[in-house]
Amino acid sequence: MTRKTDVAALAPRSRPVAERDGDASRNERAAWRVGLVLCCLSLLSALGGSSASALDIVDVRWGFNGKVAPNRFNLLSVQVQNPTPQPFDGEITARKALGGAGFVDAPVIERVTLAPFSQPTWVRFYVYITGDGWGNSTSNENWKLSWRGGNFDVPVPRVAKYQRVVLSDSSGMLRKGGAFKQMPDELFPPFVTATDALQVVAIDHEPRQWSPGQKDALLDWLQLGGTVLMVHGINGKFPEFTGTLSVLNSPVEDGRHGAGRVMRLPRAASTIDADEARQILAGLPKNHVGPNEKPEDLIDLVDPTLSTQINNGNAYSEGADPFHSSSFLGQLKQMTKPDHNWLLLHFMFLVYIAMIFPGCYILGKKYADFRVVYAGLLGTVLLFSILFSVVGQRGYGESTAVHSVAIARPLPNGSMDVSAWSNVFVTGGARYDVRHNGLGTLYSTCNQAESVNGTITNGAEALFNVDIPPFSNREFAHRIKLPGPGPKLKVESIQMEEGRLAQLSLSVEGIKPEDVEPTQFLLLGNRFYSLTWREGLLHLASDAGDATALLQLQQSQQWSNNNYSYGYDPYNQKSVQTPKDRFTLMFRPLLSRSLNVGREREAQQVQLPPDIVRVYLYAKMPPEFAVQNAKLGKQEGEVLYCIDVPLRESPSP
């Protein structure tokens, strides 16, 4: 029979109209969703691309006069703007590059927010310049700025330990000429901790846009020994100051403000040439110029005869600044130097090797079971891992600790200007927050050889966040304006004979005699005197010689150059054993650093005002100097207090 095929059954069934419309609607909605997602992704990509390029570097300026002071924190001013219609909110990072081998130290970060089509805005970075090459070369100071989607190579800076500028009004007419470089007044830092390189400031107007922090920074810097030149403005008159700066309105032609000096010169700064500037600033130290070199700043020109006399037979002491931070950091690091039981460790190592082979081989021969061999191997590895960890840890004393040294100079507003160096040793690896209770804190590891896994935020809300592996060290330096008046001294009696101290007694408050080291000194003019405690007072003990004799720069420089930052110092292994020995060893270098003296010529130029004496007390570090982190365990250190004490009567010259 012939089988009939049902054609209707083979034909595709037609769905109802409502079902077809529902599928179309669902497909349409899915297409809309895909389109919406693609639009969002395109928008985000466009925004990301625009924000990545939403930052232009307009200008970059080093220091106060375009240069940097080696072995100090320096100002790096960066002018940025946003030329796009999108806002920019992100971080700009400054980091020191090591040629083509990556970066060193930890990155310094500044948060920046810029409106669309913003006007140029200045951003301040505070970075540490090592400059440890011969002659304080900064050829290795290759800094790079980076942000999301962009970067900028900062020009290599030139060196000037002592910088002199005239503040210019950026909103007014610039007056070119004269011996002093111009610095826009808006760039003056709001922290005294960033003014280490500044020596002289000429002012011809009141900086009305200054913040209270900038005004305080100028007065603190002046109190610590800065020099202000009051000169005529565009109206041919001296500027008149208001508020806290009104102390500069004194009519005295050459007056004192703490250890600083205010001079009034009835002329414009643009009319002061290099020869006149050298005469005005004759008593101030000059930037070092090597043999057969000409100074970039003619103010630093030295009498060739005097220069030859100083350099003859003493060229070594006229080289690089010996008191770089790694000198102090290396000594602090050695206070937690490992003292392992190497004999036991080597014996354990030999036993471990023997148990692996032929131990495991013999075990396999005896039991002929691979599971026994694997168990023996894993057990041996686990056992000796624990043993090596325990024995290795005991070389460090198994305690987290911080060792520090600091230089502290009291300020009249109940605070102290502090330069400090610290070494943190931890037994437990983690990321640690390093912060201090103060104003204008600046951090740096001063590392010249390796990258540091951490970030640094300097200034008002300073923080050093760093990863420290277990049983290892992390060194760092910092500057801070610390709350607290420190010790207070007062002259009770004084007697002078032929311009030198014959008798002196000082009352002391705010510090216990038992917390002070046996060595204390007093500086009058260029001469040091040793002091001793007796009946609750500090009394004159003996004449210790001038600054050159006491500071012993040759020996201190040998100490500095022989000190190896990586922990091994063959020159000091036998003579220096305890932390107390190392604290004592650092006293004279700290004393030189406090005077900003690194060369014989600078020591000869040390000269305090005739109406003050400076007392140096080397004492136990109080709690307010400590890192504000309870996880860092025991903290100990020494502070060199440098206290200026007014005399009842000015000594005869």
Pin down the residues of each PLM region.
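Bacterial N-terminal signal peptides
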Residues: 34-46
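Short alpha-beta junction capping motif
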Residues: 196-239, 259-265
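Internal/C-terminal transmembrane anchor helices
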Residues: 371-394
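Accessory, solvent-exposed terminal regions and/or long lumenal/extracellular loops of proteins
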Residues: 420-505, 509-653
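Intrinsically disordered, low-complexity Pro/Gly/Ser/Thr-rich segments with frequent PxxP/GP/PP motifs
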Residues: 97-132, 534-551
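Alpha-helical transmembrane signal-anchor/signal-peptide segments
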Residues: 392-413
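Aromatic-Pro/Gly-enriched surface loop or interdomain linker
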Residues: 70-72, 131-200, 205, 260, ...
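A glycine-centered loop/beta-turn motif at secondary-structure junctions
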Residues: 197-198, 227, 243-358
